[in-house]
Amino acid sequence: MSVTPMMAQYLEIKAQYPDALLFYRMGDFYEMFFEDAVNAAEALDIALTKRGKHEGEDIPMCGVPVHAAEGYLLTLIRKGFRVAVGEQLESPAEAKKRGSKSVVKRDVVRLVTPGTLTEDSLLEARRHNFLVAYSELRDQAALAWADISTGAFHVMPVARVRLSPELARLAPSELIVADGPIFDATLPLAEEYKIPLTPLGKASFDSTAAEKRLCHLFNVSALDGFGTFNRAEISAMGAVVDYLEITQKGKLPLLQPPLQESEDRTVQIDASTRRNLELTRSLSGGRAGSLLSVVDRTVTPGGARLLEQRLSSPSRNLDVISARLEALDTIVEDPIRCDTLRGLLRKTPDIDRALSRLALDRGGPRDLAAIRNALSQGEDIERALQDPDLPTLLRDAAHSLEGFQDLLSLLDAALIAEPPLLARDGGFIAAGYDRELDEARTLRDEGRSVIAGLQKKYAEHTGISSLKIKHNNVLGYFIETTSTHAAKMQSAPMSDTYIHRQTTANQVRFTTVELSEIETKILNAGNLALEIEKRLYQRLSGAILDSAARLNQAARGFAEIDLVTALADLARAENWTRPRVDTSRAFHVDGGRHPVVEQALRHQGGDSFVANDCDLSPQDGAAIWLLTGPNMAGKSTFLRQNALIAVLAQMGSYVPAEAAHIGMISQLFSRVGASDDLARGRSTFMVEMVETAAILNQADDRALVILDEIGRGTATYDGLSIAWATLEHLHEVNRSRALFATHYHELTQLATKLTGVENATVSVKEWEGEVIFLHEVKKGAADRSYGVQVAQLAGLPASVVARARSVLDMLEKSSREGGGAGKVQIDDLPLFAAAPAPQPKPAQGPSPVEKLLEEIFPDDLTPREALETLYRLKDVSKG
């Protein structure tokens, strides 16, 4: 059976996009057929029907309404699909002009992928949506990444060994690599981080073609003005641009010139450390419970994106950190100005994403209004920052908001206060802005009154008070008088204006050139008004895009001001302090607190967070605190809080402490917590060892290392040996600043042998057989871990706790007697010695001793009487 012309067209288009679902536009619906329909119906939970036959089989079909397509697109993208959007390129009427059986022209206008989204409904407003390309050329490798929704474009050289931590830092939505060996090598990493991986042909990564592509995009003859790039960097950037040309069908987004980064500009933080410290995502994968969720007080999407970027990439440039802290000082010290700025920023829309949609021709009147409203707020923000003593960072940000008076005046005059979403709906141009549009609207909305006004005009002109303007389907609009006025109307000078149309038994009908023109205008007024508005939309959009570079700078200015004021508001509310950051190797924190735990305790209405000091300030070599103490005492919290304080300080924020002196940190490593990796065949202990190996092989003398209970996942002596050797390696080889928490109390002896190791412990107090956690860190070593008491608190059966106590007593006794815990024989520990727990005896009356105690009133006794009472108690107790 031959296929229909429509289905033949569908199959032809689908053949070009075999790896994507094809949204095939048919009127008000996007239809899907064959396997696409089956997959989409299941993913979207919509009805699967059929339409016609192909090769004797029913053709599966499903569809989604055009007006609701974005929601369905979001679902499909999140489930890992790519979608090719095929639109109608002409109307059915236009198709018929080419022949009665002609099929409406259709083609794919866009390939929707996770890394190429621009619509607000498909994006997280407060997060970047990065498309990343990785390229390897001979002995060079590089990453390039772009967010087409904001125009951000970055590149950096990166060795393959550093690919994992960089992907963890960027958290891209999509990764593109050359098909072949690089794709195969990168696939496990993409699967681990759940990043959609897209292979491209090697031609997309050709550095020579890439250079030409980039020069054409930025309208330059050479890339030297943007930086000195190696061939791998050029290749990666070119691949990003080529992929955008493929997915956007030639409509390139408004990318900013590439910003070159390098590994030595930011603190190196590997993937496991980011996960363990919960910088931007908690261990559960959500935002809640992360450091970002606690510190984020930004009020604009751009400010929120900048905060996440800074938190993910703490700086190693002292000048940059100092500039950020200086700006923060200014706003912290001026709370009134801070509140004023935050109030203005709350009304500031997202310029970046509005600008990007306009550039890709996916914008609408609300994007024009977003630019207008932002520029209007920008004028007030700039005035609020007029101060000759303003720090450079704030002064530059304020300056970026200047010089938009002409554009703002244009948009103010042209747009209504709250425009509709789509340009095709019309009604967004303000009255009085365009005379032709006003006339069209008047004719469209007030046609009757226009005709009535014209009728009055003609009645006065002819002197015929009974003159009427009427309408019928044959003549359209016409002027009608009684036949008694026929001679007058058909004689000069009236006949020069009034043109005879028809004579009936009692009436004579005329028209005028003016009436004919008005009739045409009335009939076409609606369409004309819409066309004029579309034309004006394009003109206004063009005016905005002409200022795109300056608007991008303004967007960065808004984001910077928002971030500074948000951090200032946070510092005031949470009593944070300005850290001292320098190039020393100091690490001294007074009264440090864990920002996430502190806030959680407050929300739960629990105890106040116990602040603690930390001093890892080496004179020369390593500085390591060996931290011992019971479970649940707060060791892991203490470790993490100091790492977070370092991150906050080097991103340019105040910190949760009474005082902090942070010598520049180059790397941050954290081995905290326990988890297995079953998908890769790794046990908990193996994961721990892999992460520890990475630390020992990479940490330098400016690293901050956080290690928690190394060696716990294996036999006691094996674990102790590994922890011992690890501590020595950190001290002698890495020479890092480190916090090392352990339950191996034997390690505390190393403090007497290694000059850079100091013992510290988390205090506890025992009361009537129970352990009370004080959460105070002090110098010294713990003598025990209180594991049995913690087990009791956790709710282990009383018989198990009792049995554990008896075994522990036996082991400790053997150790004291010199035999060592390992010498205890199983026979020395009778089976089931503590099980089951004895039943409580029936309640009895008070003993003689208790009766005597009840009769004693200590405050009434003289010293001699007290002594005599003690002797009496002793006699009674003997019976």
From Swiss-Prot:
> What processes does the entry annotate via GO biological process terms?
mismatch repair
- Keyword ATP-binding in record: yes
Which Gene3D superfamilies does the record cross-reference, listed alphabetically?
Answer: 1.10.1420.10, 6.10.140.430, DNA repair protein MutS, domain I, MutS, connector domain, P-loop containing nucleotide triphosphate hydrolases
Q: Where does ATP bind?
A: 629-636
Which InterPro entries does the entry link to? DNA_mismatch_repair_MutS, DNA_mismatch_repair_MutS-lik_N, DNA_mismatch_repair_MutS/MSH, DNA_mismatch_repair_MutS_C, DNA_mismatch_repair_MutS_clamp, DNA_mismatch_repair_MutS_core, DNA_mismatch_repair_MutS_N, DNA_mismatch_repair_MutS_sf
Superkingdom of origin organism: Bacteria
Q: Name one GO cellular component term.
A: cytosol
- List the keywords (alphabetical): ATP-binding, DNA damage, DNA repair, DNA-binding, Nucleotide-binding
Q: Which GO terms describe its molecular function?
A: ATP binding; ATP-dependent DNA damage sensor activity; damaged DNA binding; mismatched DNA binding
Q: Which family does it belong to?
A: Belongs to the DNA mismatch repair MutS family.
Tell me, in a sentence or two, what this protein's role is: This protein is involved in the repair of mismatches in DNA. It is possible that it carries out the mismatch recognition step. This protein has a weak ATPase activity.
The identity of this protein, by name, is DNA mismatch repair protein MutS
**From which organism does this entry originate?**
Ruegeria sp. (strain TM1040)
* Name of the gene: mutS
